[in-house]
Amino acid sequence: MTQFASPVLHSLLDTDAYKLHMQQAVFHHYYDVQVAAEFRCRGDDLLGIYADAIREQVDAMQHLRLQEDEFQWLSGLPFFKPDYLNWLREFRYNPAQVCVTNDNGKLNIRLTGPWREVIMWEVPLLAVISELVHHYRSPNAGVDQALDALESKLVDFTALTANLDMSRFYLMDFGTRRRFSREVQQAIVKRLQQESWFVGTSNYDLARRLALTPMGTQAHEWFQAHQQISPDLATSQRAALAAWLNEYPDQLGIALTDCITMDAFLRDFGIEFASRYQGLRHDSGDPVAWGEKAIAHYEKLGIDPLTKTLVFSDNLDLPKAVELYRHFASRVQLSFGIGTRLTCDIPQVKPLNIVIKLVECNGKPVAKLSDSPGKTICHDKAFVRALRKAFDLPQVRKAS
């Protein structure tokens, strides 16, 4: 299946902010590290028939480059260094790093190459896959249907929050990777800009064009890669946390907690990290239990939770965000990142549950265990066992 009308992507910045944040850190600290990453469809969708169309889009991505106005805009942000931005100016996607195949109906994608380059593929490639699939499956759906669905949800949201003090409720768009289309994401974000509680987007292109705050810090791959970069597996998570502070000592300080598990993370998140990081991000497991653990941890360390921020971003929708806000608002600062339930929430359209995750670093396995067993990713069961042993976790979950 080929011949999509035109390139899906129009800007190198059409990606999530944390990709550039991590890329700069990799550029400065791990320039020669090599990685491999793989695509996973967590649902039962047979996406292999789209392999040729995806390959065409991958080839088209080599023509994307940082434009002068984009370079100038990034230069005005406080956390990017000139050496990195000058390098990014010359960056081009290399399609040879991407192998796309149709394996009896199953879509296989493997990415290999220097981490500083491979890191850029994940988000735009997932957005391409999502848009292509929805273009063929739902040709009559689009912006109008997405906005109608959003308006209905906003009516319900207004009723749900009528008696709530919403002055500390902050919502972000995290919807790039599984969006229905680029046009739908832009329309949704532009509509949400009218709401006082909407504070930004993870998409750098939209943030620039719509004068929004770009949102994001780091992803699982930052912690995964350190499992092989660090000489000691048991201290790899602490090494990742320390390296991030080395690159961003006073900014972008929200730490992702579930690469191993929340309990393992908190054992590593002592006073030296907890005092310097601005907060934590939830991405798997029970969000209420996670939030209670985070607050208790801060209190145990003598840190006032109201000086810290908890970011919730796992499978959220507006009602779930309100429920969490009701539970935690008086005890800690809060932000909510909603993705698929904003940018691909259209009647009769089934969103894709797709990811691209790191599987190797410098030729050796890495793993994501998470607080949700179904999200475990690793080929090497022996490495998963070693990881669980290093972090004092029971040997119960299997790698997928």
From Swiss-Prot:
The keyword Ligase applies. Its EC number is 6.3.4.21. It catalyses: nicotinate + 5-phospho-alpha-D-ribose 1-diphosphate + ATP + H2O = nicotinate beta-D-ribonucleotide + ADP + phosphate + diphosphate. One of its GO terms (biological process) is NAD biosynthetic process via the salvage pathway. It comes from the Bacteria. The modification Phosphohistidine is found at residue 220. Transiently phosphorylated on a His residue during the reaction cycle. Phosphorylation strongly increases the affinity for substrates and increases the rate of nicotinate D-ribonucleotide production. Dephosphorylation regenerates the low-affinity form of the enzyme, leading to product release. One of its GO terms (cellular component) is cytosol. Pathway: Cofactor biosynthesis; NAD(+) biosynthesis; nicotinate D-ribonucleotide from nicotinate: step 1/1. GO terms for molecular function: nicotinate phosphoribosyltransferase activity. Gene3D superfamilies: nicotinate phosphoribosyltransferase (3.20.140.10). The keyword Phosphoprotein applies. Keywords: Ligase, Phosphoprotein, Pyridine nucleotide biosynthesis. Belongs to the NAPRTase family. Catalyzes the synthesis of beta-nicotinate D-ribonucleotide from nicotinate and 5-phospho-D-ribose 1-phosphate at the expense of ATP. HAMAP family: NAPRTase. This is Nicotinate phosphoribosyltransferase. It comes from Salmonella agona (strain SL483). The gene is pncB.
